A protein has these predicted regions:
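RNase H-like, metal-dependent nuclease domains and their acidic two-metal-ion catalytic environment used
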Residues: 1-203
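Conserved RecA-like P-loop NTPase helicase motor core
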Residues: 209-211
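Small/flexible residues
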Residues: 205-207
Length: 211
């Protein structure tokens, strides 16, 4: 099949049909046919492949783990990771610690922040229940990618405390404060017990619950 593809390398339209009929990947199986199209589909896919080689997907899946608890977090890439990461700070801006009046706080609140949609109950037997979510966002800066989301997490580990610790490790790694959904108290109590409640932002008044 590879030889067949090579024989059509100078004919993008025919190559596209060969790829569609004998795909190597799921994406290839769902390619559009050249029939009835006003555009040169073969050339379009050829350009897409070229662009992907020039600019590979910047998002990496993986998990944050403690290399040394409460001292250093590392990121471990894995295809089934719970985190999707598009950007990381330079090594000297990772795992930075800060104290205010003896309390651990996020050192880089001016660089970015995170939003958390948590849950309080462990996974049910039938697997129902919404996922926990975390997004980390870079604020405007001239020194790093700005005004963009850099981390996405949408998963529901069997134990809620695994989710809480995932969120804590990510916040520790980036040094960003977190805004937690106001009716979820489990994660707040967890951060307090771990000594990291200084990483939690006060909820803006205009987002408070109506009385």
């Amino acid at each position: 099949l590879k030889n067949d593809r090579r024989s059509f390398k100078d004919d993008p339209s025919e190559l596209n049909e060969v790829v569609r009929q004998f795909p190597f990947t799921e994406d290839e199986a769902f390619r559009d046919s050249i029939e009835g199209s006003l555009f040169n589909i073969g050339k379009i896919y050829q350009q897409i492949e070229h662009n992907e080689e020039l600019f590979p997907n910047p998002v990496v899946r993986g998990n944050f783990i403690w290399k040394e608890k409460d001292k250093e977090v590392t990121f471990s890439p894995t295809p089934n990771g719970r985190f999707k990461v598009a950007w990381m700070p330079d090594s000297d801006k990772r795992n930075v610690k800060a104290l205010e009046r003896g309390k651990k706080v996020a050192p880089f609140k001016d660089f970015g922040c995170g939003g958390v949609d948590s849950y309080d109950l462990d996974a049910t037997v039938d697997g129902r229940g919404s996922k926990g979510a975390l997004h980390m966002y870079n604020k405007f800066s001239m020194d790093r990618p700005s005004n963009m989301f850099v981390v996405e997490y949408a998963s529901r580990p069997d134990l809620a405390k695994i989710f809480y610790e995932d969120v804590l490790m990510c916040a520790f790694f980036y040094g960003y404060p977190l805004l937690v959904e106001n009716n979820k108290y489990g994660i707040v109590r967890y951060f307090e017990a771990r000594g990291y409640d200084g990483y939690l932002m006060d909820r803006p008044r205009h987002l408070g619950s109506s009385s």
